């Protein structure tokens, strides 16, 4: 930290280091994203042992293409952040300019800056959504969805690209209150009411069991099944082979 402080005219570094007595700053890295410089600080703080009372003891969440996140209580989040009109306009402008010219280089820099803006927007929304999910439940159960493979097996590559599915999954996996079920659990097919297995096509949005006549939204059904499978196996011997506790 002191090395970067001496090398750069950082405003407010002294005030930052004195902000809290329980913060121990260890390292600082100077990062350049092609437009701006940032200082990334690594620090340690005392663990917060406060016990928070949350709305739900446990929820299951299903990640999907149609709805980004579906919770077992019926709450849905549909988030898509695509290319901005400003970016599209800049790309059209670039096509009409001579490659390597001053104007071309200026437009390229503006495009890079707009891409960074979109990335920051996606990160901000993902952080807020994950914080919201963690604040409403003591335990979150999700499945190890292979999001990248959805690009090859569906016609929704653009929608997946504009979503924040990967960011949500990655950020949730850092929490010790998130349980990740193996991808092979039949959360969509299985009827926890009677044990029947029913295969659904991607465009089938309702799960209706032909045996017990249970009828439920497909994604809510899958999210509830995640809780069901977790509760069935969490105390069994050999659970570590089928259940990933992050």
Can you annotate each of these PLM segments?
Residues 34-246:
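Positively charged, helix-rich recognition surfaces that bind polyanionic ligands
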Residues 1-31, 162:
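Acidic carboxylate diad motif detector
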């Amino acid at each position: 930290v002191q090395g970067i402080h001496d090398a750069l005219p950082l405003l407010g570094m002294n005030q930052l280091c004195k902000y809290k007595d329980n913060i121990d700053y260890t390292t600082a890295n100077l990062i350049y994203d092609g437009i701006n410089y940032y200082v990334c600080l690594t620090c340690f703080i005392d663990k917060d042992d406060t016990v928070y009372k949350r709305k739900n003891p446990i929820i299951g969440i299903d990640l999907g293409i149609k709805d980004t996140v579906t919770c077992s209580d019926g709450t849905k989040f549909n988030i898509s952040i695509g290319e901005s009109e400003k970016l599209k306009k800049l790309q059209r402008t670039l096509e009409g300019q001579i490659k390597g010219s001053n104007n071309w280089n200026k437009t390229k820099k503006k495009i890079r800056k707009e891409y960074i803006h979109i990335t920051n927007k996606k990160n901000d929304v993902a952080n807020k959504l994950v914080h919201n999910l963690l604040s409403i439940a003591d335990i979150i159960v999700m499945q190890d969805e292979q999001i990248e493979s959805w690009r090859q097996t569906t016609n929704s590559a653009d929608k997946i690209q504009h979503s924040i599915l990967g960011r949500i999954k990655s950020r949730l996996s850092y929490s010790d209150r998130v349980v990740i079920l193996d991808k092979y659990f039949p959360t969509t097919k299985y009827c926890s009411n009677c044990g029947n297995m029913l295969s659904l096509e991607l465009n089938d949005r309702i799960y209706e069991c032909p045996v017990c006549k249970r009828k439920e939204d497909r994604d809510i059904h899958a999210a509830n099944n995640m809780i069901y499978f977790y509760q069935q196996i969490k105390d069994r011997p050999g659970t570590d082979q089928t259940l990933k506790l992050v």
